[in-house]
Amino acid sequence: MEHRGASPLLLALALLSALCWRARALPPRGAAFPAVPRLGNRLPFDAASESDRAHGSLKSESDILQNTLPENEKFYFDLSRIIDRNARHADGIFTSVYSHLLAKLAVKRYLHSLIRKRVSSQDSPVKRHSDAVFTDNYSRFRKQMAVKKYLNSVLTGKRSQEELNPAKLRGEAEILEPSFSENYDDVSVDELLSHLPLDL
């Protein structure tokens, strides 16, 4: 009888081990796995990565491991490979978008620096131009003041000490002395101008 009582116990133990074996192959409850890829719905892989190309001729450990796995665990191995590919793809997308963002920021900084340089360089020609205008106006003013001062000294009969140098005056007197002698001391400028013929 003991033999007959052990038979249902053995059968229950066999069924329980089979269920546990199958339950171990299922994902844990509440785990976030992507939808189960079927034969027709496999995710396409456009091109092999550099590491895949480097190991192309040799069988990788993952291929050897996949061949030794039982059929019910191969699905999870494929699923982990798909997740790895998706992670690499997400990393690639992030890297691409991030590099574009950095390039845009670099271009923006460069344009701001150009605009800043242009604004600051526009100030300097204006400043140089205003400095040149001031210098030009100041030199004209100085010339006008010198001419006025000279005319006042000539008209009042006062000359500077440089012009009153006797050696210089004798040399000029010999050059400017007319061949005939006339006295111009008592003649005014108005009288001289009135005797000049002016054609109007």
Swiss-Prot record:
**InterPro entries hit by this protein:** Glucagon_GIP_secretin_VIP, VIP/GHRH-like
A Gene Ontology BP annotation from the UniProt entry: adenylate cyclase-activating G protein-coupled receptor signaling pathway
Q: Which keywords accompany this UniProt record?
A: Amidation, Cleavage on pair of basic residues, Hormone, Secreted, Signal
Q: For this UniProt entry, what's an example GO CC term?
A: extracellular region
Q: Give residues where Threonine amide occurs.
A: 156
Q: Which domain of life is it from?
A: Eukaryota
Q: Which PROSITE patterns match?
A: GLUCAGON
Q: Pfam families recorded for this chain?
A: Hormone_2 (PF00123)
Name of the protein in question: VIP peptides
Which source organism?
Gallus gallus (Chicken)
Gene that encodes the chain: VIP
